[in-house]
A protein has these predicted regions:
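Structured, helix-rich domain cores that form ligand/interaction pockets
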Residues: 1-202
Length: 203
């Protein structure tokens, strides 16, 4: 088998050799801060019959490994969920939206991915090339904006307002403002500690 060198865990220790997270099409300010898109979710409308085609051909997509789940009929859920592992991240694909009538609409779907982690992988673009002919319309449903500061987490604080606030002390201090999965939700945490970076970085 092919053996490739790279960052690895040995006896539970992570070497501090990474100096920054991966970015794709990021914007860097003069102060050294970095803006990037850390998650994208697209709502998909499939051409008639193409949802069924994807259901039977998704297993041919090139990736490290894949997982697939078929859900019970539950209004508002997804009939099929696919996960394609690409390196240290993955791409999620949903096929078949469950309507309030409990009918499965195979012409609806979604795709979710982190461009910072998968856009540098050629297999991701090949996956999109296979998906594109099946889609009649794609609409941006959600994106997460990452703002990275080359500063210690101890020097940063989240300004509270009337939204729900929570603070967690575990592997550094993590603060939350707002309701998860809703517009304006904010999370401030020690990115350096999370990724075992050699320098200081707060996201």
């Amino acid at each position: 088998p092919d053996v490739k060198s790279g960052s690895c865990l040995i006896a539970g220790f992570q070497p501090l050799t990474v100096v920054h997270p991966s970015y794709w099409n990021a914007y860097k300010t003069e102060s050294g801060a970095t803006f990037s898109i850390d998650m994208v979710r697209l709502k998909l409308s499939f051409i008639n019959g193409k949802g069924e085609w994807l259901s039977t051909h998704a297993q041919t997509f090139d990736c490290d490994s894949m997982s697939a789940w078929t859900s019970k009929i539950r209004p508002g859920g997804w009939y099929e969920l696919w996960s394609f592992d690409l390196g240290d991240s993955s791409v999620a694909l949903g096929i078949g939206f469950m309507e309030p009538s409990c009918k499965v609409n195979m012409n609806r779907g979604f795709i979710e991915f982190n461009p910072n982690k998968v856009a540098g992988d050629k297999r991701f673009w090949r996956l999109l090339e296979k998906l594109a002919p099946c889609v009649s319309h794609a609409r941006l449903k959600r994106f997460d904006l990452a703002y990275d500061l080359p500063t210690s987490r101890l020097d940063c604080r989240l300004s509270k307002d009337r939204r729900m606030y929570k603070s967690v002390i575990s592997n550094g201090i993590t603060e939350y403002l707002g309701v998860k999965n809703t517009p304006g939700y904010v999370k401030v945490y020690d990115k350096a500690a999370e990724m075992h970076l050699s320098g200081m970085l707060t996201r």
